[in-house]
Structure formats: structure tokens, C-alpha cells
UniProtKB/Swiss-Prot annotation:
Residues 22-123 form the Ig-like V-type domain. One of its GO terms (cellular component) is cell surface. The gene is Timd2. Residues 136-215 have a biased composition (Low complexity). This is T-cell immunoglobulin and mucin domain-containing protein 2. Belongs to the immunoglobulin superfamily. TIM family.
Length: 349
């Protein structure tokens, strides 16, 4: 009878339960139940919780293990067994759930002679917002600010305060220029002169050239000529005045008034040909100096060598001369002996 009950209880443990589903909001706790029968309390019943289905994983991704009395392995503090383990209550409590906790879970109890397992499917949803989302208020078309193109870019040049930009110099003639020449005629001579007036209307144009200018002032006077033709000199007084980097042109409406004209400075033009000729002349001078040095050095060396040759040739010539004298004396003696050996030479001749 007892064996029959054990057999029936084993069959009941082998029957798998239906897969239950649980849904929880993120941040809350959830409990997955797992309770097995403790008919035989004398033997230990190890249990485990893991991720995945029981038939395929068998607690390979273990979360927690027990030996039937206490927890022997715990993957994280979020996984708790709050039931009475010795009474067969190994329900799993997951605290502070997150979205990644979603998925299948498996509980296995290793009962002697049989296995008990149960599968669960957990779904963790994201936390719902407490207030509805606010939609942005569309007040019309978006306003796009485009940069205003005012034409060419404005370049600010630094103002040089060292030199004045405008200088006005009024031309003032204090006394009229009058030249009188005495004449020896009976008739009266009348000389009419007109003084130089200061210009009433002055137009001043200013500019900033890089070089100083030369201002020539022409002052002309008219003289009325009478029969005796007394001439009045027309004086031209050029004035060379340095300017402060300004061209001043003064004109007047009166033709008899003084006219001051500004002669624009002529820019110095660089002549590249002149520099080329100067360079060629300098190069030719260097070559000539080098050739002279070589010639002088060679002449001194040759002169030194020729002096040593003369010094060697002098004793040689003396030795040769002495040898020639010895040979001549020997020849003379031979001739004398020949004459003595032939006493009949004079008679036969």
C-alpha cells in the first residue's frame, strides 16, 4: 500500500505544470511561486532557480541554489527566498525589477526518485509617466534669421595718428612785387602795377603720397607799357618747401591772383638692368683678380725652379770643361810624338 502511494506521488511530481505568466511594472517586486511536497523529510531536497526553460536549461543560468534547508548560492541580493525552505516553499522574489528581467524562469526540486519543475514567463514593463507628455506649441512657421549681406566686407584699417591727415597752408603775399627801372627820357613814364591778392576762394585737396613733394609758386604781375616801354620784371619765386606728406593744390578764380600747384611726386622706378650690369661687373672683377693671383703664383714657382736648375748645371759645366782640356792636352802630346818619330818628313816634302 505504501509503495503504491510513493508511485502515485512520483507520477504527480513528474507531471509538468502549465507555464504561468506574470507582468510587473519596472521598479516593483514580483514573487514567482515554487512549492513541493515534503513527504520524506529525512532526505535532503536540493532546489534551484534559473533563467530559461527547465527542459532546455536545467538551471544552467542559475540565480539561487538551496540544499533543502538554506541558501547555498545567490547571484544577486535582488533574488530572495522569503518562504520556509524546510517546508518546501522555495518561491522566488525579485526586488526592484528592471526591463532586462523579462523572460522565462525555471524552478527545479531534486526529489529522490523524481524531479519537480515549474516554468514561468515574466514581463517587466517600463514605468508609466505620471503626467501626460506636453506637446510643443506650434505658433506658425519657424522664423529663420538669415544673415544680411551688405555687399563687400568692411575692412577696418588702423588710423595712423602720428601724421596729420589734412594740412591747410594759405598762401599769403604781404607786399606787391614792383620793379622800377629809371629811364632818361623827356616824356613822363607811368608804370602801373597790380598787387598780388590773396585768393578769396580756396579749394584744398589732400592725399597721402609716400614721398615728399615740391611746390612751385608762380607769381605774375602785369605792367602797362607806354611809348618809352619801361619794363617791369616778372619775378618767379620758386619755393621748395618740405611737406608733411600732403599734396596741397590752391586755385583762385581771379586770373591775376597767385596760383599754387602741387606737382605730383614721381615714383622712383627700379631699373633691373642696372643691377644686372653691376652684378656682371663685380663677377668680372673677381675673375680678373683670381686670374692675376694664379699667374703671379705660377711665375714665382717657375722662377724658383729655373734657379735650382742653373745651380745644378754650373758644376757640371766646370767638370766638362776640365775633361775637354785633358783631352786636348793628350791630343797635343800625341801630335808631338808623331813629329818626333818621322825625321824624314821635311826632306821628302
Amino acid at each position: 500500500m505504501v509503495q503504491l502511494q510513493v508511485f502515485i506521488s512520483g507520477l504527480l511530481l513528474l507531471l509538468p505544470g502549465a507555464v504561468a505568466s506574470y507582468t510587473v511594472v519596472q521598479g516593483h517586486s514580483v514573487t514567482l511561486p515554487c512549492i513541493y511536497s515534503t513527504t520524506y523529510r529525512d532526505e535532503m531536497v536540493p532546489t534551484c532557480w534559473g533563467r530559461g526553460e527547465c527542459r532546455s536549461s536545467y538551471c544552467t543560468r542559475s540565480l539561487i541554489w538551496t540544499n533543502g534547508y538554506k541558501v547555498t548560492y545567490q547571484r544577486s541580493n535582488r533574488y530572495q527566498l522569503k518562504g520556509n525552505i524546510s517546508e518546501g516553499n522555495v518561491s522566488l522574489t525579485i526586488e526592484n525589477t528592471v526591463v532586462s528581467d523579462s523572460g522565462p524562469y525555471c524552478c527545479i526540486a531534486e526529489i529522490p526518485g523524481a524531479f519537480y519543475f515549474v516554468d514561468y514567463l515574466l514581463e517587466v514593463k517600463a514605468e508609466l509617466p505620471t503626467s501626460p507628455p506636453t506637446r510643443p506649441t506650434n505658433t506658425g512657421r519657424p522664423t529663420t534669421t538669415r544673415p544680411t549681406n551688405t555687399g563687400r566686407p568692411t575692412t577696418t584699417r588702423p588710423t595712423n595718428t602720428g601724421r596729420p591727415t589734412t594740412t591747410e597752408r594759405p598762401t599769403t603775399t604781404g607786399r606787391p612785387t614792383t620793379t622800377e627801372r629809371p629811364t632818361t627820357t623827356g616824356r613822363p613814364t607811368t608804370i602801373s602795377t597790380r598787387s598780388t591778392h590773396v585768393p578769396t576762394s580756396t579749394r584744398v585737396s589732400t592725399s597721402t603720397p609716400p614721398t615728399p613733394e615740391q611746390t612751385q609758386t608762380h607769381r605774375s604781375e602785369a605792367t602797362t607799357y607806354y611809348p618809352d616801354q619801361t619794363t617791369a620784371e616778372v619775378t618767379e619765386a620758386p619755393s621748395h618747401t618740405p611737406t608733411d606728406w600732403n599734396n596741397t593744390a590752391t586755385s583762385s578764380d581771379d586770373s591775376w591772383n597767385s596760383d599754387t600747384e602741387a606737382i605730383p611726386p614721381q615714383k622712383l622706378q627700379r631699373n633691373p638692368t642696372k643691377g644686372f650690369y653691376v652684378g656682371m661687373s663685380f663677377a668680372a672683377l673677381l675673375l680678373l683678380l683670381l686670374a692675376s693671383t694664379v699667374a703671379i703664383t705660377r711665375y714665382m714657382v717657375m722662377r724658383k725652379n729655373s734657379g735650382s736648375l742653373r745651380f745644378v748645371a754650373f758644376p757640371v759645366s766646370k767638370i766638362g770643361a776640365s775633361q775637354n782640356k785633358v783631352v786636348e792636352q793628350a791630343r797635343i802630346e800625341d801630335e808631338v810624338y808623331i813629329i818626333e818619330d818621322s825625321p824624314y818628313f821635311e826632306e821628302e816634302s
